Regions:
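Short, intrinsically disordered terminal tails adjacent to the first/last structured region
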Residues: 2-17, 22-69, 579-607
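Central hydrophobic cores of alpha-helical transmembrane segments
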Residues: 302-308, 348-353, 500-508, 537-549
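Extended hydrophobic/aromatic segments used for targeting, binding, or gating
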Residues: 307, 318, 511-551
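Cleavable Sec-type N-terminal signal peptides
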Residues: 2-20, 25, 29, 365, ...
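Primarily membrane-embedded glycan-assembly and transfer machineries that use lipid-linked glycans
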Residues: 58-336, 340-343, 368-517, 580-592
């Protein structure tokens, strides 16, 4: 009875948070897992069953009756990825038109003309932007939960004290052997997370099962096997490929929340995955509510539209996962709080976002550059920077000891995390983006030319070439980063702290880091800079539309993501250029224009 009530509550939450499309998902979450004998059956002969009674064959004409019928035509209202992308881009173009029209009216002194209708339309497009990221309720072709992601982050967080960063695939294989599937483990390859980070055979794992089991108590090992059994069945024929991904990479600070929730929610099940997957949508809704509160309707609509349209960070990658967007929510909300002059709490959230995924630290670097410059000039920190610093220090002071308690380890935890981070930094991926990807790219060294299926890791040669290319031009990478950093400092040194935070993150993360494509939702704060230059929002939407244009190019994925990364770098430099223009040429903020016009009219009346 209790479980029935739990399922009903989960269904209600899904309907409220995710919309009508979640009704079917709630039904799925309360249903039993479908039988998958091909995935779960151990390597044992099947039981002998008595032969079934012979059934008389149907006449041939009846057998062919259905074959002759053509398949039904899909409804014009049926959802496909192509239709969804077209709808998102169509809404984006409509928003561009509304914004430009509104700004023309403001510049001509007619800001009140159609104002209510324009605001309603812009608000509608903003809401559809948020909804559009969820593929308008279709999620992963009707499946809300990203099971692959839950395997990595639910298992990785729940058993982090035993697995750490190097033993996820090794221990999964050891557990699978004890589940009666030794032959299947022996016949496939897994990624070696501990040593080479390359894909290879499982011989060493099979020969040394105690290497994994010595880290578990007997009770925890049985729980682990039960959870692995669930994911083997749930992933089905995708399970072998899941063992070739890149493991669990949550930071020690993210692991605080991840580990506590994964252990509290109970064994891996449809219900537990569904409930954990609800957390990201709730945070995303909170994030966009914060944007509307801090920056107003137009900027909310631009940010939401970018989120929906941007191809690299689409729902496909991390939608329906376990807390993969918390870093984004805390970082964006931190900037919103800086805008509303809640500097202490804003600094705490910026520090939290950085701790949860590392690269968001560049959003905090902007205010830090300001603080350093002003201290150099005035020998004192401003009040806003003092509050930001205090908030960040308090958050860090809480997160560091908590991470060691949850991980049941000491300072060696951070050494292991640093090694894991360095390992991934030296592992090029076909969906990497950023300046390093651009510098290491060569048209003759693409995956199309270097992929070798005769190797255990078909991309090994391609990776080696990428690393060599980067090492030859490392000096250029450093020099360009210094130029970008100078541009950020020069642009924001006398601006409010929120401007420095937004610009530094949007510019420096593509320049200084090499991230997988799905993190590029971090570009959302580019919309905030419409407060200073309204074209910043137009360029951001055009950037998102441009990523779809790049996908139409007849090239391989590594080339496509290189071009998307280059476009993101260009957007950052365009922001610096625009903000460096003389103040007299600066466009009025969309949020401030009506107020300025009203003030001007009042002045004329007084005269």
């Amino acid at each position: 009875m209790i479980h029935a009530h739990t399922r009903l509550i989960a269904a209600a939450i899904a309907c409220l948070v995710l919309g009508p499309g979640a009704i079917a998902l709630a039904d799925e979450a309360t249903a039993a897992v479908p039988d998958q004998p091909s995935a779960l059956a151990p390597d044992l002969p099947a039981a002998v069953t008595p032969p079934a009674a012979p059934v008389a064959p149907k006449p041939l004409s009846r057998q062919l009756a259905n074959v002759r019928k053509p398949p039904p035509e899909p409804s014009i209202f049926s959802y496909t990825e192509a239709k969804g992308n077209a709808l998102k881009i169509g809404f984006a173009v409509m928003l561009l038109g509304l914004l430009v029209w509104g700004w023309q009216l403001e510049d001509s002194g007619q800001s009140r003309k159609w104002r209510r209708a324009r605001r309603v339309a812009i608000g509608f497009l903003g809401v559809m932007g948020v909804y559009g990221w969820f593929n308008y309720g279709k999620f992963h072709n009707g499946n809300f939960v990203h099971v692959w992601e839950h395997y990595h982050y639910y298992i990785g967080a729940k058993y982090f004290p035993e697995l750490r960063y190097a033993r996820l695939y090794e221990c999964s294989a050891t557990a699978e052997v004890e589940l009666g599937r030794r032959a299947r483990v022996a016949s496939r390859s897994i990624r070696d997370l501990a040593q080479t980070n390359l894909i290879g055979p499982t011989d060493d794992v099979l020969a040394n099962p105690e290497r994994c089991k010595e880290h578990f108590s007997e009770a925890r090992w049985q729980d682990f096997k039960q959870d692995i059994s669930f994911f083997i069945g749930r992933l089905g024929n995708r399970w072998p490929d899941s063992q070739k991904d890149h493991g669990y990479n949550g930071t020690p600070w993210w692991n605080i929340t991840g580990s506590i929730l994964a252990n509290l929610i109970g064994p891996a099940s449809e219900r537990s995955m569904f409930l954990l997957a609800l957390l990201d949508p709730a945070l995303i809704l909170l994030m966009f509510a914060g944007i509307w509160w801090a920056f107003g309707l137009e900027i909310f609509a631009v940010a939401a539209t970018f989120f929906a349209v941007n191809f690299p960070s689409r729902y496909y990658w991390n939608g329906g996962a376990f807390l993969r967007y918390d870093y984004l929510a805390w970082t964006v909300l931190g900037i919103c709080l800086l805008k509303k002059k809640r500097h202490g709490l804003g600094g705490a959230l910026l520090a939290t976002g950085a701790a949860f995924r590392l690269f968001p630290v560049f959003f905090a670097v902007g205010p830090a550059l300001q603080a350093g410059w002003r201290f150099f000039k005035e020998r004192v920190l401003s009040a806003e920077h003092r509050k930001i610093l205090v908030g960040a220090v308090v958050a860090t002071a809480l997160l560091v000891p908590a991470s060691m308690v949850v991980a049941k380890g000491g300072l060696e935890l951070y050494s292991e995390f640093a090694q894991n981070t360095e390992k991934h930094a030296q592992t090029p991926l076909t969906n990497h983006m950023g300046l390093r990807t651009v510098i290491s790219w060569r048209p003759w060294d693409s995956a199309k030319h270097l992929k070798d299926n005769s190797l255990n890791d078909p991309f090994q040669t391609w990776k080696e070439h990428r690393i060599d290319n980067y090492e030859r031009l490392r000096w250029l990478f450093i020099a360009l980063n210094l130029v970008f950093l100078w541009g950020v400092w020069r642009t924001t040194r006398d601006e409010p702290a929120w401007v420095a935070a937004a610009l530094c993150g949007v510019v420096m993360i593509p320049a200084a880091t090499e991230l997988t494509c799905y993190y590029y939702a971090f570009m959302i704060p580019g919309a905030f800079l419409m407060e200073k230059r309204r074209e910043a929002g137009l360029w951001l939407i055009l950037l998102a539309i441009g990523t779809h244009a790049i996908t139409r190019m007849p090239i391989w994925d590594d080339d496509k993501y290189m071009w998307m990364g280059l476009a993101s770098l260009a957007y950052g430099w365009m922001l610096i250029w625009a903000l460096l223009q003389p103040k007299a040429a600066e466009a009025r903020s969309p949020a401030l224009a009506p107020a300025l016009e009203t003030a001007g009219a009042s002045g004329r009346r007084r005269r």
